[in-house]
Amino acid sequence: MNKVILYCRPGFEKECAAEITDKAARYNVYGFVRVKDNSGYVVFECYQHEDADRLIKELPFQELVFARQMMVCGELLRDLPPEDRITPIVGMLTGVLERAGELRVEVPDTNESKELMKFCRKFTVPLRAALRENRILLAQEKASRPVIHVLFIAPGCCYVGYSYSNNNSPFYMGIPRLKFPADAPSRSTLKLEEAFHVFVPADEWDERLGSGMFAVDLGACPGGWTYQLVKRSMMVHAVDNGMMAPSLMDTGQVIHHQADGFRFEPPRNNIYWLVCDMVEKPAKVTNRMADWLVNGWCREVIFNLKLPMKKRYEEVTQNLALLAQRLEENGINFEIHAKHLYHDREEITVHARRIWGAIPGRRDER
């Protein structure tokens, strides 16, 4: 198996291809990319046979911005016989994988492929049984073992492969299944909820998303992102010249500042989270987020960058480099991650965290 498949949002195949080519080269892995517009996936074919497995082990999945999932696979299985689709799939995995912990029969995130979803659900049951019988799949799901992926791109045509559970997306099709809350002021609320799932490990939610924290939401109206903070029992400074949803103001947890989000400064030095979903040039937003982190006005930020129509990958890399440069110049320890979330459209979501600790010449404890 010498191919790496990456799932992505339809329409962003070129950005996904540019990113995997760039980042694979950093690990001395070289190959070529097969891209089909609006297909929802990209195939990176490695020149060296063993490089595909090495790449999905060594390239941290969380460093990929445009990929929803990353797996190794072999050649496309075409024209699977309707009377026996299982045998070729089992044959593809025999001798390659043993004792996998989970099976996912998936499709790309396109309207055409979604017509195959019903078939995939039904097909999973007999395929799972056959894989267990051949000892390719464990009798019980095990989160620490590799995941088998069967990606149907058309009726009777699929890629078969695997990912490592410690370096993949834990979600089916790479998409968190979130339900829109009926009382939320706008659908944008799902962007921040998804960001929390992607950027903050579940076992750290109590510490980093706990009740009683203070947060700032720049460009808050009508309150989609503020809603997520309020739901987690935080106190929120909502900054926007527009009006906030009365339902949020009635909670008593929101202070509304009718001000410019790019000029607002926190009234007290007790802010943990800064979130921002303002429509503005990416560099302007990035610099303002850097200001907050450099000045110690917050510990963690989540913000959106609206992308141009062309050279979107270049725009992303430039802004992430700008943010890192600003923090490095000020001697700050930090983590930065970015993702093109399922609920993002022509934008990406960035998370940056200031690592507070003992730095010579500074007092970083609070």
Swiss-Prot record:
Superkingdom of source: Bacteria
GO CC field: cytoplasm
Reactions the enzyme catalyzes: cytidine(2498) in 23S rRNA + S-adenosyl-L-methionine = 2'-O-methylcytidine(2498) in 23S rRNA + S-adenosyl-L-homocysteine + H(+)
Keyword terms: Cytoplasm, Methyltransferase, rRNA processing, S-adenosyl-L-methionine, Transferase
Residues at the active site: 306
EC number assigned by the record: 2.1.1.186
GO MF annotation terms: S-adenosylmethionine-dependent methyltransferase activity
InterPro entries associated with the record: RlmM_FDX (IPR040739), RlmM_THUMP-like (IPR048646), RNA_MeTrfase_FtsJ_dom (IPR002877), rRNA_MeTrfase_M (IPR011224), SAM-dependent_MTases_sf (IPR029063)
Entry's localization field: Cytoplasm
Ranges that cross the membrane: none
Main location, first listed in the record: cytoplasm
Biological processes, Gene Ontology terms: methylation; rRNA processing
Residues binding S-adenosyl-L-methionine: 188, 221-224, 240, 260, 277
Subunit structure, as described in the record: Monomer.
Family: Belongs to the class I-like SAM-binding methyltransferase superfamily. RNA methyltransferase RlmE family. RlmM subfamily.
Function: Catalyzes the 2'-O-methylation at nucleotide C2498 in 23S rRNA.
UniProt cross-references to NCBIfam families, sorted A to Z: PRK11760.1
Listed PANTHER family: RIBOSOMAL RNA LARGE SUBUNIT METHYLTRANSFERASE M (PTHR37524), RIBOSOMAL RNA METHYLTRANSFERASE FTSJ DOMAIN-CONTAINING PROTEIN (PTHR37524:SF2)
Protein name: Ribosomal RNA large subunit methyltransferase M
Organism: Dickeya chrysanthemi (strain Ech1591)
